Amino acid sequence: MPGPRRVTAVPLTVILAAAAAMAALFLACGAGMPEGGAGGRAAGAGASGRRPNILLLTVDTLRPDHLGCLGYPRRTSPHIDALARRGVIFRQAITAAGRTVQSFPSILTGVNPPVHGLRHEGQDSGILEGRLTLTRVLRDNGYDAFAVTQGLNVGLHRDFELYDPDIYIGPDGEKVYRPSRDDRDASVKAIAWLRSRRGNPRPFFLWMRYDAPHWPYAAPPPYGEMFDPAYGGPHTFNAGQKPEPRRGDMIFGMTRLPPREVEHAVAHYDGEVAFSDQAIGDLMKAIDAMGETARTVVVVTADHGEGLGEHDYFFEHGAYLYEPIVRVPLIVTAPGLLPEGKVIDPVARTIDIMPTLIDLAGIPVPEGLQGRSLVPLARGEDHGPAPPAYSESGRNYFKENPRQFIEGTAGKWRMMRDDRFKLILIPRDPEPIWEFYDLAADPGETMNVIDRFPDDVARLRSALLAIVAGDPGRDDRDEPPLADDLEERLRSLGYVGGGDRP
């Protein structure tokens, strides 16, 4: 979930004028690309010494099992699938957190939330000031950096030259909280920026945040009805639901929707995925027309997944840490640098994205990151065993949540997951709840087998408790208050109001 918007609105005309001026300046000065790394040209640079462009495509709330490249039968993702055919799929990629405000900082800093410190909506995003980011490393090595984030501000704007969060800003500068987001607008802005810098010899880093699959499910025609055109029931599953069940009751299965209604909601979700995919296709087509495809590394991932009824958790994320929430797509396409059409089974983590992209750019990976480069794993080189993935839950918005026993950071669900096993810690007084799943035998996480694998339980428990012990907020049972504008934004996305937590 986005935090309160504190970034000054930057009109697109100003963005393009600044970009054009920068391009002209570098051309006039004859600026070329710096040599990479401490020892000259690095592995990520091509024959000309030019580092690759880097395009980070993040789709809010995108489940990997709803993509065609991972076996989904509906045609939700032809453009993402095309990228997957040219790249590497990390089949078991795990997010560091189940909510946006924690997850994106982990992607761009390469560390888990207990280290970067942003744990709840409402926190001052200045907590990230001074934290090394992917953007900072790339800019220090000759990259231009632009982000189109659709209202997101979690303190990551500081290192971008141009950062456009303005999709929620109206024509008169007022804040507009609207239930539908148009991912096409995001691609249009990015394409305009890319065209404005044609001829600029510097590589670009472009971060795109698409967020159509996030509730409320309200894709424009034809996507909204693409996968269930015959539906004739009462629900639209967007901001105008009629009848409107209490959101908290619906999320946690207390208001039981008939199976046909759930099917329709999933069809709406799939339509949103297809809408985001088309926006990605528009951007990739433009990059290809500019002749930049062969010079561009592309990553497709998500901040978290979405519950679609598993574990009685409907159309939401962040409260629990089961596979539909923590498992995300991770596709890396790197022409000439990584194999094509390869699927990797060992666990990967979203905190691995930063060091992986730095490595692919031919830049030495900084020390102090918890993530590690996935390049050796993708190339089939000896990489050592994959470290287990940590994840944590987000802020509890709904009093109806039957499995949130303690508020604040102290009450966060926490998880460690390796290639086969998952251990979940659920804080509760006087004793916590522990759940342990053998994902190879039970991918749906239906049987707690904590008594059957004592050695694996001990191994993952030791790793998890070490993280808890080092967490400065581990005993904090308070949550920061929500500013009025943030609360209004959260209300538009279904997190507060209508019988839910204030």
Q: What are the roles of these predicted feature ranges?
A:
Residues 3-17:
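N-terminal Sec-pathway targeting helices
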Residues 1-2, 496:
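Accessible peptide chain termini
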Residues 17-502:
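Catalytic domains that recognize anionic headgroups
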